[in-house]
Amino acid sequence: VFGTLGSTDDSLFGRYKQDIFNDHRGHLQGQAYGSR
């Protein structure tokens, strides 16, 4: 799910996911999204 969404909309979804997951456990996910 993450790979698909990130690959499709890296700009829109990446930002949204980063913000949402930053509160739960996006520190790692956020960094991965930023790098990708």
Curated annotation (Swiss-Prot):
Keywords: Antibiotic, Antimicrobial, Secreted. Its main location: secreted. GO terms for biological process: defense response to bacterium. It holds the Pfam family Gloverin. Signal peptide: none annotated. It is found in: Secreted. One of its GO terms (cellular component) is extracellular region. Antibacterial protein. This is Gloverin. It comes from Heliothis virescens (Tobacco budworm moth).
